[in-house]
Amino acid sequence: GLGGAVIVRLAVYLKGKDAKKYRKNVEYGSARWGSKTDIAPFMDPKPENNIILTQSEGLMMSGRPKNPANARNKNVLVVGGSGSGKTRFFIKPNLMQMHSSYVVTDPKGTVLIEVGKLLSRGTPKLDKDGKPVRGKNGKIVYEPYKIKVFNTINFSKSMHYNPFAYIHNEKDILKLVTVLIANTKGEGKSGDDFWVKAETLLYTALIGYIYYEAPSNEQNFSTLVEMINAMEVREDDETFKNAVDLLFDALEQKDPDHFALRQYKKYKLAAGKTAKSILISCGARLAPFDIKEVREITMYDELELDLVGDRKTALFFIISDTDATFNFLVSMAYTQLFNLLCERADDKFGGRLPVHVRCLIDEAANIGQIPNLEKLMATIRSREISACLVLQAQSQLKALYKDNMDTIIGNCDSSLFLGGKEETTLKSWNSLLGKETIDMYNTSVTKGTQESHGQNFQKLGKDLMSVDELAVMDGGKCLLQIRGVRPFLSRKYDITKHPNYKYLSDFDEKNAFDIEKYLSTRLPVRPGELYPNYEITPEELAAQTTA
């Protein structure tokens, strides 16, 4: 009895004292590929309600799943070298889902041509019970997307975009100046931000004057350029006043505390020679607006950026993949878009837009820098906005956003690698995938007077995919990593299997979207333009009917 209890107690003590922590079969790493079970909680049973990522994996559009632990933001980082299929395997499949509004960067303008007809057909109109509405003929009624296009390759095939149309207060003026400075080049001395600060003062003053004092049809970049051109400076005569000086003198008489006047007075502290240098830098920065086509395309606005989240809209930014001259206009539009949608969500819709807005930013490194993108990526999620950054290599993001690159990538809950050989990208994915534990079996033979044989079993760690394996990955395969989920090695999405594929021009050339024809059917109303009104009496109408 007692002796047995002592022995048992002693055995337990000795075992505990000599206890070791074992992790069987994961000694060198627990990495493994994801399975259907891993992705199931993150996908909607209805395929049309998902973001398409691979042939077998997706992400539910609902931001509030039944289990809050399964909530993920919809920001996606897509990396793939040239020819890896970023458009075919990611952008077009997601446009075919048609569950959101879309803002698409479209290099060369081919995506709009290929999917435009599908979007103009739209989605079935639903009643309050979520069932399709049918017309008198029994056919389902469809609601077409509102298609907008801003074309920096051919301005004659573009709608108008006027950044001034979205200025509503002094804060908006400062935002516009910030994005203008960030995406255009002046002629200041390298490494000295004095010139940038001086230009900022002048732009803020002039744009403030235009917004508060000019008629609506003159609130555009054309007026800004004319004001810069009218600002003659005489180095030998500090008392000389140019036409713009006289405008601000008159403004001071009317409102001594005017926002624009306060900024202009700060600019005027510069001496004649310095002021002249500032104007030269401003002239260089605004040089694109001296081009007649650019001045005309920014004369008034048709894009309605603030309404993209109110109704299903598809906005296409067509950019050149070889010439970045006018890409700053697209960056400016993206910056205004994010700010406008966030403000509209907060001010009008209680924090969430009625229609989710997905920004599919192809060639994200080529449109220029979007100021504060690292902060926007973290805050847009709650407003029903998401951004998909599509790049050829991660190093492109580093070159554009410097130390903020990691923050931007960290705010993308999903990362998709379609293939490539850029070293930074390969090393990043190699590290992300981790190591697995494998079994190694060695045999040995020792020959001599007596031959002996040996066997050795041991475990070691191996990269789930090494750098060289990543570089030669099958062109039909891709890698997907979703936050908190095992990585997936899957097939790229087969676009021909999508139920809406038959409406693309890929399926039938007759489905090609005619941009010129679409734009010609619109009758744009320009600010300040007068239109004649005609009245027809009932007698005249009756006479016309019987004639």
How does the language model describe each region?
Residues P47, L53, F328-T335, W429:
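Conserved long hydrophobic alpha-helices within structured protein cores
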Residues T37-A40, F328, A364, G420:
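A short glycine-/small-residue-rich loop at the edge of a beta-strand within enzyme catalytic domains
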Residues I319, D323, E363, L391, ...:
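Short loop or secondary-structure boundary microenvironments that flank
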Residues G1-S84, R88-I91, K125-K136, T446, ...:
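Basic- and hydrophobic-enriched, low-structure N-terminal and domain-boundary segments
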Residues M377-L479:
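Conserved ATP-driven motor cores of ASCE-family P-loop NTPases powering translocation/secretion/packaging/pilus
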Residues N67-I385, L400, M405, D468-L489, ...:
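P-loop NTPase motor domains
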Residues G1-I51, E170-L180, M227-A230, E451-I482:
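Short alpha-helical interface patches
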Residues S35-F42, Q55-P68, T274-I280, I319-D321, ...:
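A broad, low-specificity signal for short, low-complexity segments enriched in glycine/proline
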